Amino acid sequence: MKTNKLTHIDCFAGPGGICTGMHAAGYETLVAIEYVKSCCETYSANHPEVHVIHNDIRKVEKKDIVDFIPKEGVDLVTSGMPCETFSLAGTTSRSFYDDRQFLFREGIRIAKLSKAKMILFENVPGITSKTVSKDDPTLIIDVLKQELTEAGYGNFVEAKLLATDFGVPQKRCVPTTHLMQYIIA
């Protein structure tokens, strides 16, 4: 597979919001991985050119993506893993510590499988203050950065960005509602 555009794999793809932004930035999304069926259906309807994998990302193997990506690898893997475990909202209605807080490892794994040149993580700012467990003060963000380095993605930049600063017409009562944490490596 040859393409003249920058190429992209969308992990934790949801209904395709990151894909839409990546297309606007000149990327060609080749593969999307999403667990929720209704999100896959919406994604496929909005982006029929993308190979959508409806599966738990932990079960996705190289054989599932290799036919859809260039042999030399992709330019970018995005990983917008579920934010519930990092969100400061609704902490009384969910388990504060669960296995979702380590799903960033799957984004790294897919980046390595696809020989990605770069990986972009996106999540709520709460990811920067979440600890591994009640008894371990190690921050999840520090574990993520360590594992990025171990995987060969040690040159990274972190940023908190407010969506409204980039033309997203979403203002709510709380001015930081759409503040998001990004790490690009």
What are these regions (language model features)?
Residues 1-29, 39, 147-150, 154, ...:
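S-adenosyl-L-methionine-dependent DNA methyltransferase catalytic core
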Residues 30, 75, 117:
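Conserved acidic residues
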Residues 34-38, 57:
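Short beta->alpha hinge that forms the Motif I/post-I loop of the SAM-binding pocket
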Residues 37-41, 62:
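Short alpha-helix immediately C-terminal to the canonical SAM-binding loop
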Residues 43-52:
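Short, conserved SAM-binding/catalytic segment
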Residues 55, 60-63:
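Cofactor-binding loops of NAD(P)H-dependent oxidoreductases
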Residues 63-72, 84-185:
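Class I S-adenosyl-L-methionine
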Residues 72-80:
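Short SAM/SAH-binding signature in class I
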